[in-house]
Amino acid sequence: MQYKTKAKKSLGQNFLQDENIIRKIVQLANIKKDDIVLEIGPGLGALTRYILKCSDNVNVVEFDASVIDTLLQNCQKYGEPKVFNEDFLKFDLDIVRADSQQKLKLIGNLPYNISSPILFKVIEQSDKIIDAHFMLQKEVVERIISQPNSKTYGRLSVILQYHFDCSMILNIPPEVFYPQPKVDSAILRLKPKANKLVINDYIFFENIVKQSFAQRRKTLHNNLKGILKELDIDPNTLPVDTKLRAENLSMEDFVSLVNFLK
């Protein structure tokens, strides 16, 4: 592997350089020959090389044009990925699906400074993917997989768990990166739920969840009183106890609440 390119702090770049960890990540992604794979932020191609060994259809979206030559050089012995020098947040997944209805496998060492926007983009496209394996700050992964009544349980937990089965499948120490980040990392697996709960108004669901967690120490009654007043709804008639805080409600509770309100 060549590491000629200096990592850019502004893009949240930290390049993987431990071959054992790299192999393990790709192995856990369980990529098959006929899978269409889309890697987000391949950087210098650490993961890409091993993905090319597994699949005949490897696509990468890389925002930083300055790393692409090195990426392709590092991949030479393994094959050639199709490179899109674009911002993933504006990228159309249907481009790599071509005319097929085949779903994609997503993988990537995500830039930590924009991981949340990327995750929300993946939510929007969840019907087009088989699964996703992302390296993220461990603290973020812990928030995503958190359960109710936990300090780390929040908006991201509820929204992602509505769409996906979420699990942390590998811990990754800072020393396997160049440059070393100041935090631990982890691999998050997202698998779209086969039977999602029905929501009458999904945008309203997102708004209710966001508003409920707006001030964590406040009760649902205080956080939602403006919305309840606007809808002319008596808090005592709701299917959840408004004296509770948002962190006490399960994802299913939020769905029940939203379907009652709309």
UniProtKB/Swiss-Prot annotation:
Cellular component, GO annotation: cytosol
Cell location: Cytoplasm
Keywords: Cytoplasm, Methyltransferase, RNA-binding, rRNA processing, S-adenosyl-L-methionine, Transferase
UniProt xrefs under Pfam families: RrnaAD
Binding of S-adenosyl-L-methionine, residues: 14, 16, 41, 62, 87, 109
The protein's enzyme class: transferase
NCBIfam families to which the protein is assigned, alphabetical: ksgA (TIGR00755)
Role according to the record: Specifically dimethylates two adjacent adenosines (A1518 and A1519) in the loop of a conserved hairpin near the 3'-end of 16S rRNA in the 30S particle. May play a critical role in biogenesis of 30S subunits.
Protein name: Ribosomal RNA small subunit methyltransferase A
Organism of origin: Francisella philomiragia subsp. philomiragia (strain ATCC 25017 / CCUG 19701 / FSC 153 / O#319-036)
